[in-house]
Amino acid sequence: MPKKNAISESTNSTPETAPAMTFESSLKELEQIVARLESGELALEEALSKFERGIQLARQGQQTLQQAEQRVQILLNDDTQSPLSHFSPDTE
């Protein structure tokens, strides 16, 4: 039986049937999709399909980042011994 390409399998999966992907693998797939879309070489239907998959991946990534941020906040709030201040990327 021929082996299928992992990326083509994941692009045809629905969110309900898709195997759990790491944040990094989702980001890598999203970057590949963006590159293919930017190349302008895809047929309309394939481009639309890739765009839909990209939106799914972007939403999954956003959710993963929000969950990570919540976990960090919980961990920081559990430490009552040290005073904390909000992080600002402009302040170093």
From Swiss-Prot:
One of the record's GO molecular function terms: exodeoxyribonuclease VII activity
The name of this protein is Exodeoxyribonuclease 7 small subunit
GO BP, sorted A to Z:
DNA catabolic process
Annotated source species: Photorhabdus laumondii subsp. laumondii (strain DSM 15139 / CIP 105565 / TT01)
EC assignment: the record states 3.1.11.6
Assembly with partners or alone? Heterooligomer composed of large and small subunits.
The protein's matches in InterPro entries, at most eight in alphabetical order, are given as: Exonuc_VII_S, Exonuc_VII_ssu_sf
Record's function text: Bidirectionally degrades single-stranded DNA into large acid-insoluble oligonucleotides, which are then degraded further into small acid-soluble oligonucleotides.
In the record, the note on similarity to other proteins reads:
Belongs to the XseB family.
Pfam annotation, one family: Exonuc_VII_S
Give the Polar residues compositional bias ranges: 7-16
Annotated keywords: Cytoplasm, Exonuclease, Hydrolase, Nuclease
Subcellular location, record wording: Cytoplasm
One Gene Ontology cellular component: cytosol
Highest taxon of the source? Bacteria
Q: Which reaction does it catalyse?
A: Exonucleolytic cleavage in either 5'- to 3'- or 3'- to 5'-direction to yield nucleoside 5'-phosphates
Q: What is its main location?
A: cytoplasm
Ranges for the region named Disordered are 1-22
